[in-house]
Structures are given as structure tokens and as C-alpha cells.
Amino acid sequence: MSKYKVSVIIPVYGVEKYIGKCLDSLVNQTLKDIEIIVVNDGTKDNSQKIIDKYAKKYKNIKALIKENGGQGSARNYGLEHATGEYIGYVDGDDYVEYDMYEKLYNKAKENDLDVVICGNYNVSEDYKNKTTDLEFTKFDDNFINALLGKKAVWNKIYKRNIIGKTTFRSKVWYEDFDFSIKVLTNAKKIDYVNEPLYDYLIREGSTMNNSNVDRNLEILLAFDEIIKNKKYDKYREIIEFLAIDHIYISTIVRIIKANVSKDKKKEVIDKLINYMNNNFPNYEKNKYINSLSKNRKIIYNLIKNKKYKTIKLIFKIKKG
């Protein structure tokens, strides 16, 4: 018998400005039977002092400290200590709506679900602007929706036994993507509470804004593993679309926007396109391309025609 209904795991590194707001949103959840596992991943700031204050006041907070190993490693460590029936993840610079875990847990228990997914707010760093970002639900099959939708782990709860021995890769950018594909393809029952319940803070210091352009190639490791998986043939067309969406569009756009030389950009983009051609030679005929948003279809076609300067200009105008 699980001790708690939900265990929420929060990796902490360099978030002393934000961790108090994050913990406030968790200790005040309307679902009271919740375990809060805070993992200090060797942070050098004052986050631990803030965590200790909360841990003294709230008995359901489990404060753990480990050597720095990256966000994935911290999540794995937290999971080892979790006792909840369901598992959730929150990033230390984000926060959640006060009824998030009650709504997700109640939905899970209604139909004995393996995974429950919600929408989120995108929040500006000064907290002044919030925009709603609902989940992808274009298809009647929630399994397809989940695989084609957001690969973040923070807008979901997972039944503990569906995670099993699945772990996050350590010190890679795409740990959420890798973990999500593995767990979602193990799930039998998935559903949605499609309202914004998670508050995702968009800040310049976030991991994926790093200018080290070569690290974008780490996503290919995740796809290598997916292709080797015995379930690949069953989900081939979906995986191919994910490669279009994540390798061909998102990653190439990130490189185009990066502050590196033109030659370096070309080198990395060529590697990504070669990977697509070698592993998904018929990707241009994928039926799910039609499910791309209007803006992403435009970007897709610009990349196909190598109009990289136009893409950079679009994002420059959008930013400013």
C-alpha cells in the first residue's frame, strides 16, 4: 500500500530566487495526501536554506542532498525515495496551481489511468504575463495525442508501476523526451484534464537556452534508442513524425537562432538532416505532418527549402 497518493519530485540547482514560490504552491495543494521530495543536486546557492525552512514546517517534505549529476540524475534519486501511488515532477523554478494534483489524481482514480496530462501557463520571468498552453488533443486516440503532444514530464502524473525501472539520462538536454517516449509506450490508459494547471517560467537562464550548439545533437541519441526498441515497428509513423517535429523543426530552429558562426551552424544542421535522410527516408510523406500548427508548417517548408535567413528574421521580428 502506498503511503501517499502522489509523490512530487523537485530537482534543485541554482533556483534560490524561485524555490520558495515553487514550494508554496506545493504545500498548499488541495490534495493533502501528497509527498514533496526536494532533491538538492549539489547547488552552490542558498536554495538549501530555503528548503530546510519548509522541511522543518511541513512533515510531508523529504529534503535530499546529492552530488551534482544533472536534472535527470536528481529526478532518479528522488524516485528512489518516493512512496506515492502516482509520481509527478516539478522544476524548481516553476510552480503549480493549488488544485493541480487533486484534479489529476481524481481523474486517474476514476478510470484507473496510467498517465494523466494537463495544460500549462507560460509565465514571463517577472510573473507579469501568463499565456495558456493547452495540450495536443486533435485525435480520438489519447495514446496518439500523448505521443504527438508535449514531451515535458512536469504536466503529468504517472502511476508508479508504469515507470518501473525507466530512468532519466544524466546530463543530457533531452532527458524529458527520452523518458516520456519510454513511459508512454508502456502505458495502457492515458487521459487529460486539459486546463492549465502547471506554471512554466520562461527565463533566460533555463537549460535549453545554452549556446553550446553541439549539444543539440544529443537528441539523436534518444532517437537511436527508440529505433532499437522492439516497439519501434508498432509506432514507426508516430516516431517518424516526432523526428520531424523535434529534430527537423525544433532543433534546427534552435541552431539557426544560436550565436555561433555560419559554418558551425551548417555543420550541425547537415548532421541532423543526414540523420533524417538515413533513418526516415520517406519522412516528407508522413501523414501526421498535417497536424502541425500553421506556424510550424511554415517553418518546416522554409527548412526544406533551406531558407534559414528567413527563419532567423521571423524569430527576430517575433522577439522584438
Regions found by a protein language model. Give the residues of each.
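Membrane-interface aromatic/basic loop that binds lipid-linked glycans or pyrophosphate carriers
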Residues: 260-320
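Catalytic core of nucleotide-sugar-dependent glycosyltransferases
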Residues: 197-203, 210-235, 249-250, 254, ...
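N-proximal low-complexity "stem/linker" segments adjacent to membrane-targeting elements
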Residues: 1-27
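Short aromatic/hydrophobic "clamp" motif used to bind/position activated sugar donors
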Residues: 87
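Glycine-rich, basic loop-to-helix element that forms the pyrophosphate-binding segment
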Residues: 66-82
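A conserved acidic beta->alpha catalytic loop
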Residues: 25, 40-49, 91
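Donor-binding/catalytic cores of nucleotide-activated saccharide
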Residues: 71-72, 92-192, 201-214
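Short loop->beta transition adjacent to catalytic acidic/histidine clusters or analogous donor-positioning motifs
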Residues: 3-6, 27-38, 46, 58-62
